[in-house]
């Protein structure tokens, strides 16, 4: 899970971790985890926090090493990124769905895809649109749009 973090996120977590490990022991007490998460904007109730700590503190030492800490924090950071991406895609879809009827035409989708990757040939675009608009309706709803933009379930 922690390999999904960017270098910037890892550096941010390292700084937060080090701030709570002033003796440089290489671990923080589990009691500090809630404090750090709330500083990162995540308020958790005691039961949820205890569950998360129990899951991450695999050796039950009451101490969280940096690796355990990044695994724990990655859940929140990656989740946040996914939510932010979803909101951005919703907004992008709304911009192209000018009539507000919940779908865009395949012509509009073609423009979007071309803007995202100008190396796509007309054949590439035709194949992609054929796959996306499997019912041949000439329209793409938000769910289909999301599948295209996020790579679907495969």
Curated annotation (Swiss-Prot):
One GO CC annotation: centrosome
Amino acids binding Ca(2+) 1: 57, 59, 61, 63, 68
Domain EF-hand: 8-43, 44-79, 84-119, 120-154
Origin: domain of life: Eukaryota
Family annotation (SMART domains): EFh (SM00054)
Gene3D superfamilies according to UniProt: EF-hand
Reported tissue expression: Present only in adult muscles.
Keyword Membrane: no
Annotated GO MF terms: calcium ion binding
Keyword Metal-binding belongs to the record: yes
Keywords for this protein: Calcium, Metal-binding, Muscle protein, Repeat
Binding site for Ca(2+) 2: 133, 135, 137, 139, 144
One matching Pfam family: EF-hand_7
Homology family: Belongs to the troponin C family.
Protein's recorded name: Troponin C, isoform 1
Organism (species): Drosophila melanogaster (Fruit fly)
Gene: TpnC41C
